[in-house]
Amino acid sequence: MPAYEIRPLQLRILEILLAVDKVCREHGLRYYLWAGTLLGAIRHKGFIPWDDDMDICMPRADYDTLMAHAKEWLPAPYEAMSAETNGKYPGSFGKIIDSSTTLIERAHYAYLSGIYIDVFPIDGVPQRACRRRLPFARFEFYKRIVYFLHRDPYKHGRGPSSWLPLLCRKCFSHAGVQQTLRRLMLKYNYEDAQLVADYDDGLKGVFSKALLGESTPVSFEGHELKGVAQYDRYLTQKYGDYMQIPATNHQRQHNFYYLDYNQPYSEYKDQRKFRL
């Protein structure tokens, strides 16, 4: 169990989403509730009771537009975070964070942020399955490199377990690997593709673009937000019998390392030591 109460965190996260929803409506940007957040909207009319994060997705052009204009469009204290804006951030997707808070996801993650929602870009993929395997394999390879670049090489001691992280530091740079990941995702244009994907979800995240379609209004914590057009098809593909409540031991949470609702992450005095 996490050392924090779930419901207060959910309500702060919801405030971020409502700000993003307002910006997207004002500027004509497409977004959709995604993954467990969409599941919560359909099954619970809001958050899954034990869920402590929030996901949305956006077609690539809309995602890039939001990230590029977040500083001018988002009201304080919200800001965008991505690999392009933070050299310590390991993700291939972005976050919108509440900069008046501090959140450390894992003890071994060097970057600091605030409470956030995840924003996943959706990109085109090849129509033929045989042509999808290589780009996704390369994407997973470079994603693993990012992990080793950000992990303390001596996390498990100075033996063989440190060799691969140390080798990655000699052969790769964070910026270079992130540029490679972005090139892989951008190779196939979203607007021209019939099949699209959230690359971070791997090959199982490939689906028909028609599934997104024109957004479907969904109720979430008393607010009307945007879900994918064919939500039943998407949720069935991702979760199977998605209306079935999972057993307690399968109710997953993040269990964040550190959470402070009142201190801006920019003022947090990080006492952790990293050998990066």
Q: Whereabouts are the PLM-identified features?
A:
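Conserved catalytic core of two-metal-ion nucleotidyltransferases
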Residues: 1-27, 67-127, 147-157, 161-238, ...
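Aromatic- and glycine-enriched beta-alpha-beta binding-site module
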Residues: 124, 136, 141-142
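A short secondary-structure junction signal
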Residues: 129-134
